[in-house]
Amino acid sequence: MAEDSAGLPSNYQFWMQKLSVWTQASTLETQRDICLHLPQFQEFLRRMYETLKEMDSNAIIERFPTICQLLAKSCWSPFILAYDESPKILIWCLCCLIKKDPQNSRESKLNSWTRRLLSHIVSTSRFDIKEVGLFNQVLGYAPTDYYPGLLKNMVLSLVSELRENHLNGFSSQRRCPERVRSLSRDRVPLLTLPDFEPLVEALLTYHGHEPQEVLCPEFFDAVNEASLLKKISLPTSAILCLWLRHLPSLENTMLHLLEKLISSERNSLRRIKCFMKDSLRPEAAACHPAIFRVVDEIFRSALLETDGAPEVLAGLQVFTRCFVEALEKENKQLKFALKTYFPYASPALVMVLLQHPKDIPQGLWHQSLKHISEMLKEIVEDHGSYGGPFESWFLFVHFGGWADITAEQLLMSEAEAEPPEALLWLLAFSCSPGAGHQQRARTMVEVKTVLGCLTKLFRSPALSARDLQAAAGENLGGDPRPPACQQLVRRLLLHFLLWAPGGHTIAREVITLMAQTDAIMNEIIGFLDYTLYRWDHLCVEAHRSRKLARELLTELREQALPGQVNQ
């Protein structure tokens, strides 16, 4: 096409052919060819605009029917839209096609087609907000036509820059720390918008070369709150970065969890497990020992401050179970040695406790319990190098199922058999780690006496509540038992009611006699809830015992006063 007849550059046909090739093939050679010719093509567009702006839209279409094809192919090329001022020049060219007062359907259709292309360019290109506003004012279409695409493109552009990617063959410059900090602060009001999630993730995983944190604290706080309230969904890798870079976020998450443990989710381990997996991310703790140790230390402090509150203890055990599952799933080959998770504990004891009871033949449980007891006793009573009694107890109760298995094993042993000292010591230690040697010995005597009576009654066909009252009666001259010992005896009685054939018929009567206070009522409900949870994980096949435990749990929850126990 001649330049004098068309009013367009003489190489118009050359670029039409190039665009056809570029749009039909997406090979590496094609992309290189595009990048090679982008400067010349932009100059062609500029000269073409200088020609088109002097013409009426009808005249342009009448004389040059392929102009729409050329502009459309240019507008849908991400390489052209990403290069320098090409998007602006394309907009100028398209504006030449718009008829301000269309007189017929053909002109109206051309206007609609042109506006769609303009909206596409505005929403996919990087423009200053003032330029976007100017386009809107001149072209006369609503922001809703292009804002969603513009927002998405802006987010993708920022993500690309943060990750120092190469866009269409052009390297984006690294952002300075002040710019990254400003970016994190300015996006706080917007971070719950779904389109902003990739940017939030990119900011959290951004790693510059600065010695100090570049993201603002307000950003971390807002992300953590939004994550807790389910207003934003982030992958575990981003949550891991959040907690490693901002300790208060992890602490706030833990405080939120503990509040639920003690209030709304009390005695509901299944809901606690779901909540814990959603918010605390045990897999994040498995991925990095630092996170596990912070969570562990918060649980430790909570147990000390609440004097070993059962709900906190149960939460620790659920967290540990989830953590171990994540550890086994994510780290078939451990990235970190176990000692980095439990730096002050005996490695041998940790290895034994990490074994899930269901992975050990039931006939060997007694042997495993004896081994655990001997190792703990050596550390506690021989003053080993792994901390005091509380530290050993704290490690043991992470894997609290072993203590309940100990009680069950002792109850179901032969009536004539002498209860093993190792298992008695383990029970006494589990209920009162701070007790001295003499106090622990007394507890062992108390438990041994109660067990002797219960094992004799275990297979009795006819039982009464009075029989169990007598079996659990105070001993040693009538001195009152310490509270921890009383709680241990109650747990033995509850185990008996669930496992003894004759216990099922008197269970409700015995529990009514036991639950003299709201605290004991909550204790019994917590025991039943945890027992069912533990049996599920052990795959215990005890239909009658399970049925009784579920019925008792439902009935006691209904009896509990509103606000005392989660419904």
Curated annotation (Swiss-Prot):
The gene is FANCC. GO terms for biological process: cellular response to oxidative stress; interstrand cross-link repair; nucleotide-excision repair. Keywords: Cytoplasm, DNA damage, DNA repair, Nucleus. This is Fanconi anemia group C protein homolog. PANTHER family: FANCONI ANEMIA GROUP C PROTEIN, FANCONI ANEMIA GROUP C PROTEIN FANCC. One of its GO terms (cellular component) is cytoplasm. It is found in: Nucleus; Cytoplasm. Its main location: nucleus. It holds the Pfam family Fanconi_C. DNA repair protein that may operate in a postreplication repair or a cell cycle checkpoint function. May be implicated in interstrand DNA cross-link repair and in the maintenance of normal chromosome stability. Upon IFNG induction, may facilitate STAT1 activation by recruiting STAT1 to IFNGR1. InterPro entries: FANCC. Belongs to the multisubunit FA complex composed of FANCA, FANCB, FANCC, FANCE, FANCF, FANCG, FANCL/PHF9 and FANCM. This complex may also include HSP70. Interacts with ZBTB32. Upon IFNG induction, interacts with STAT1. Interacts with CDK1. Interacts with EIF2AK2.
